[in-house]
Amino acid sequence: MKKYLSLLLACVLTLALRCAGGGKDAAEQTPAPETPPTQTAAAGGVDTSCKLYFPNDAVDDLHADTAQIPDAEPAVTTAYAQAITEQLIAHNALPKGSQVLAISKDGDALSLDLNEAFLAGLRESGSTGELMYMGSLVNTFLDNFNCTTVRVTVEGKPFSTGHSEYDKPLQAFTF
């Protein structure tokens, strides 16, 4: 019995150390290559390149890649924000059914209002899934809208998941 308790204690301590900073420091984190949004002419509109952040295979860090948003101008509009959201969903970086209800920018602060499907998926994802979803969402929107904070709401209200309260603006997630 003591053997099992010792093993359990060792696992809990390892997990606690990992969560408290045993991961990569911001200085050690591999920086994503700088790829500002670009526009290329396309038949029927403008294609915009945007940077997406999504979980790596080990689900312990975020990986950055670029995606093309067809027929979209990079602007603070619900349509452009939804196009980015759909790219994140396609990379399993946001819950299916997530939709942008509203977006606004005031200086370097972005406000993003999402639907109940986003919150339901977030609550079902567990603590690691929640961290990856929120990190993907926040880092992607910070990068593409050149902001320092994102306030995320659901149906216009702050929300909680059981793991975290989301009632304040969020800054970039680092792991």
Describe the residue ranges of each PLM region.
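Bimodal "functional hotspot" detector
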Residues: 2-13, 18-175
